[in-house]
Every structure is written in C-alpha cells, then in structure tokens.
Amino acid sequence: KLPFFVWSDINKKITEHYLRAAGITLEQKKAINIFLLDANQRVLDIKTGLERSLPASILKFYGELSPQQEPMLMSVNAPVLLMPNLLDPPMCEELITLWKEGEHEESKVTSVVGDKEVTRKHTKVKKRRDFRIMDPGLQKVLQQTIGRRIAPELEKVFHFGGFRFDRFVVVCYDSERGDYFRVHRDNLSPSTADRAFALTLNLNVEEYTGGELVFPEYGPHKYQPKSGGGIVFSCSLLHEALPVTQGRRFALLTFFRTLNNQQK
C-alpha cells in the first residue's frame, strides 16, 4: 500500500493550473511527469523525465519528509494557522544576512498614551533589534512568494481576502541581550487598527532554543513553526514572544491589512 494518494490527470486540466502557477514554459511542459503534493495540495517537488528510477525516487522523497505527527486529542487550541514551506532555505539565509550586514535598530512599540499615539522604545514591553526591508525588488519577491502561498489559506480558513501587505521586517531576538516581547495585541492604535492578521515566519529554528509564541487567552501551549514556515493569527489575539534562552532567533514579520485604509 502506497503511503500517499495517486491521481491521474488525463485531460491535463489540473496540470495546466500547476504549470501556470509555477511559471513553467511550453518547452518544459513536455518533460513534466509528476507533481508531488503535500496534504494541502501544495507542490513540494516536480519530477521530470521517463527514467526507470522515477517511482523509486518518489518513494524516497516522501520517505525523507518529516514524519507525520501522531494524532493528538485537542481540547484547547489557539485559533491560529500554521503553514510550512513559505520560504525556501536560501531565502531564509539571505534575509538573515541582510539583518547581519544591514543597519538594524532597536525595535519600538506604538501605543496610545493619554489621547495621543506614541511610537517609542519601551524595553519593559519589547526588546529586540529590527531590520526594515526597503528594497522594492525584494519586497515584491516576498509579496509574490508569500502571497500566493498564503492567500488561498486565509480565504479558506478565515474567509479573509483582498488584503495588502504591511512592511516586511527581519527581527532578531538575542539570548545574550535577554530579548523578548511581552504580552500584547497588534492593532490597538489608530495607525494599526486596520491590521487584520499577523505573520511570523521563522528563519533559523535549528540555531536557538526558546523564543516560542504563546497565546495566553487559549492556554499555555507554545507555537514554533519550522524554519521557512510561518504562523498566522488575528491581530486581536493577545500573544507573547518568549525569551530566547540560547542563540539568536531570526524571523520575518509582516501584517495583512484590510483594504479600507491607505498604507500607514
């Protein structure tokens, strides 16, 4: 028994959609044989050619994937969306390098003090260093890469569509500095009120300990997507980034804003 389903697309209707989304040319189409999908029908790999070893290579590919978790009985869970493979390892490394070689700064918080909105350093609440991505070319690549992978899920899971990206920020939580972000919400000031969902995309999970996200309104559970994977959640949820206890945690952050206001 195969550990996965096999579908035959005789009329090539489904294949055409995948080819178009992947940007594959007409010349390349002739060599395409098999699309390898995950449980959510996202393309993991494309196998080409007619070699005899193709079936064996497919079995090997699926066998080397991270093992599926055993079913767990869930009684309490935060209403969040965990998504793997939003960015590939080279892009994760590129973003970390940008932070290391670029001009990063102490992160600030935006809040309402009295009747005024104030943006300031507030180390009792947040302590980390940020690098804001200003390169239009890289912004476009991230928007297209992440957007096409995450937009269908936002629509399917939360019935949320028609968003626009906020800025992209590469952040670093350093254990030697004792970095953290205390419990907070992401949409409590006038300039952040149209933030609908937040995305935290981990870049180097294998290189640090700690730094998980928690959502205290929904139990003590800790959330940590693998490198290249992200977690999406409503900006109205109370959440916290726990201190990194060893190493440095790098992550890419952005928000999905509604379309009823201009970009802040």
What are these regions (language model features)?
Residues 1-65:
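Chalcogenol-based redox active-site neighborhoods
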Residues 39, 56-198, 202-230, 236-264:
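Fe(II)/2-oxoglutarate oxygenase catalytic core
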Residues 6, 231-232:
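Structural recognition of the beta-strand scaffold that forms the well-ordered cores
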